[in-house]
Amino acid sequence: MTISNSVPITPELIAAHGLKPDEYQRILDLVGREPSFTELGIFSAMWNEHCSYKSSKKWLRTLPTTGPQVIQGPGENAGVVDIGDGDCVVFKMESHNHPSFIEPYQGAATGVGGILRDVFTMGARPIAAMNALRFGAPDHPKTRHLVAGVVSGVGGYGNSFGVPTVGGEVNFDARYNGNILVNAFAAGLAKTNAIFLSEAKGVGLPVVYLGAKTGRDGVGGATMASAEFDDKIDEKRPTVQVGDPFTEKCLLEACLELMASGAVIAIQDMGAAGLTCSAVEMGAKGDLGIELDLDKVPVREERMSAYEMMLSESQERMLMVLRPEKEKEAEAIFHKWGLDFAIVGKTTDDLRFRVLHQGDQVADLPIKDLGDKAPEYDRPWIEPKKPAPLAANDIPQADVADALLKLLGGPDLSSRRWVWEQYDTLIQGNSLQLPGGDAGVVRVEGHATKALAFSSDVTPRYCEADPYEGGKQAVAECWRNLTATGALPLAATDNLNFGNPERPEIMGQLVGAVKGIGDACRALGFPIVSGNVSLYNETNGQGILPTPTIGGVGLIADWSKMVRTGFAAQDQMILLVGAPASWGTHLGQSVYFRDIHGRTDGPPPPVDLAHEKRVGDHVRSLIASGIVTAAHDVSDGGIAVALAEMAMASGIGATVPGLVGTDPIPVWFGEDQGRYLLTLSIDPHGDEWDAIRKQQGELGIFAPWIGSTGGDALKLGDAKAIPVGDLKAAHEGWFPRFMDQAS
């Protein structure tokens, strides 16, 4: 079946394309006539939230995006950060939420494929991937099916392509029942003098189509990704793309070989809105027009219309502006790799986007108004209502050991081994830390000592309670996780997942979170260099928890001094760095409240950014000195869970006497921010320890020696000792049991 270009443009058709009446009027004013059906599709694709960021652009501009290490900030396919010696790291995080809910395997797989293309389009070879996944309640009938499909899709694509998955997150909450989140991160290495951008340059130059053939899969995908879901969700299945990781691997090698030949002027991957978005972005960025001849586009289905070809989101495709004298060489490279190579258009000097098909001009539009001059909204927003503070004596009690075992064996804090064992975490041979620690770490190929650390973080329940503090905390925890390996945090990418921005309370969540992210990034010297916004994550009016995911990258100068989470030896001192005098105080929004007592009240823990920076810099200096043998940031579940994780990672127990005369619940389960647990290899009664104590006093950092490693059990204060084997059994049991339940 093919779709005519002369379909009548009705109000119903306009609405079906996600365009509001005032937006359609703007189209009429710009074009001076009724648009063709293909033109309507082009406007719909370019003006939706997924491509235009029309609801969030105003606030994204407030984020810090520069720094001495930043080579390329937002606006390109990925961010680029200098790591010295002529090398740079290229990275980005992007959502594939809506497709993954409709068709979990292909949705997740093509999410991985898309983010890998964003990285190698810039000239970088991918070296690491992460995935931040949010699913509905474990007892929801769809959850297990979605988990199985998404994890299989992530592993199927990443493993076949050949990139290690080094970290990520998996969480469950009923607010994701109708909208799961699949946020995919990728990073690659490139040379600082060989970064490739998407800005077209030069008039009359060939525009070249590269990669796989075009089919009807994914038609309307970008528009679907900008809409709320309803009960007819399964009808959207045809708009999910289908990925082929082996073709993508060939595309990677062909692109890098072509880039090395000097043939590439500009290059853009075909992601959301396919040929439309890639062509418009290349032309608009370069202040050039683009003319495309769709009769030249390689297709794998018969009788495809111009509309379908322009909006197809078939995977593993690129668009490039080529040096004309290199055409034969470029074509030979792509044919060698078994890929299509076709000159499908040219650059022009008239700022028009023209599309030809079967002898007709099916689109003739102003390219800048499609691209960087798309509509932008200053949507009304209201400050979200914040929860009341908890009364000082509002500390519900529980047996400390029993509560710890229940937390470790629950849906949110249990081991994710079932997930990451389906991913190839060691391919390429450079992975230095397996998933399950604070951050993934990968050696920098060709350098004797350098490594890169990667972490992905956000605590949605904090963001729901207070978006500003939640935004700050997402950045701070990411920065802290990188620091806990010994890495210097360099820069971050954000993936902002929210509900319907046309509701002022939801827009208020977005505004608050972005303000918090911006303040934290400025205070920590941790700029945002790339990112993605995913809105309308709602089903039948029920929105997700606000989830501004932060993916961070850090540099380890000497990976021989890198530290891991697990205790390294018996009889080593345990240090709690950055804590208040009572070690822990804050129970509002804690997992202890939620999972032990069924409470979701109270404010989230505040983040003191000056304290965060001071403590993190101190921890990093201790690690660099070589005396730290293990490190772990304290987050969900407080000190108790952090100590248990360190014990389980090593099989070594610990004894931590606790505080006399202090309620043990906030001590062990409080989620105060800015804290680390370290083990040291030095004599706690020697001069070296005295010098460290003196330095901490001068910095105003409270860092008590709270206990020692040793034995095969974890003993917290007066609570009964828990054998490390029992901790592991609780921790490792939940996920396999959940996934093995009979359907």
Swiss-Prot record:
Keywords: ATP-binding, Cytoplasm, Ligase, Magnesium, Metal-binding, Nucleotide-binding, Purine biosynthesis. One of its GO terms (cellular component) is cytoplasm. Pathway: Purine metabolism; IMP biosynthesis via de novo pathway; 5-amino-1-(5-phospho-D-ribosyl)imidazole from N(2)-formyl-N(1)-(5-phospho-D-ribosyl)glycinamide: step 1/2. It is an enzyme of class 6 (ligase). Mg(2+) 2 binds at residues 118, 269. One of its GO terms (biological process) is 'de novo' IMP biosynthetic process. It catalyses: N(2)-formyl-N(1)-(5-phospho-beta-D-ribosyl)glycinamide + L-glutamine + ATP + H2O = 2-formamido-N(1)-(5-O-phospho-beta-D-ribosyl)acetamidine + L-glutamate + ADP + phosphate + H(+). GO terms for molecular function: ATP binding; magnesium ion binding; phosphoribosylformylglycinamidine synthase activity. Mg(2+) 1 binds at residues 94, 532. ATP binds at residues 53, 92, 494, 531. It comes from the Bacteria. The active site is at residues 50, 96. Signal peptide: none annotated. Substrate binds at residues 95-98, 117, 241, 313-315, 534. InterPro entries: PRibForGlyAmidine_synth_PurL, PurL_linker, PurM-like_C_dom, PurM-like_C_sf, PurM-like_N, PurM-like_N_sf. It is found in: Cytoplasm. Its EC number is 6.3.5.3. PANTHER family: PHOSPHORIBOSYLFORMYLGLYCINAMIDINE SYNTHASE SUBUNIT PURL. Part of the phosphoribosylformylglycinamidine synthase complex involved in the purines biosynthetic pathway. Catalyzes the ATP-dependent conversion of formylglycinamide ribonucleotide (FGAR) and glutamine to yield formylglycinamidine ribonucleotide (FGAM) and glutamate. The FGAM synthase complex is composed of three subunits. PurQ produces an ammonia molecule by converting glutamine to glutamate. PurL transfers the ammonia molecule to FGAR to form FGAM in an ATP-dependent manner. Belongs to the FGAMS family. Monomer. Part of the FGAM synthase complex composed of 1 PurL, 1 PurQ and 2 PurS subunits. This is Phosphoribosylformylglycinamidine synthase subunit PurL. It comes from Mesorhizobium japonicum (strain LMG 29417 / CECT 9101 / MAFF 303099) (Mesorhizobium loti (strain MAFF 303099)). The gene is purL.
